[in-house]
């Protein structure tokens, strides 16, 4: 990113540190599948591309990537439902 090279360099360094640390209790495949799920939930096209490719390189198959996407969709839907219930509770109290 031309406008903020320092920030971009820091972000990429953080990415490398977290995703490539060897003393982590999570292996690369697990990290990438978690990242795929989060990327789907945050709706970041760049992140989806990077982490699906990373998951594939770490050994993920299509079913694992699909499961990560579906789990994140489920959790996201659950959060939306909970906020809907909150809206209805507030409506009852108003």
Per-range role (PLM):
Residues 30-39, 66-74:
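Alpha-helical scaffold segments that form or flank carboxylate-/histidine-based iron centers
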Residues 34, 38-50:
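Short, thiol/selenol-centered motifs that function as redox-active sites or metal-ligating centers
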Residues 27-28, 45, 62:
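Alpha-helix N-cap/helix-initiation sites
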Residues 1-32, 83-94:
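Acidic, glycine/proline-rich low-complexity segments that act as flexible tails and inter-domain linkers
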Residues 19, 35, 52-56:
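Amphipathic alpha-helical segments within well-ordered protein domains
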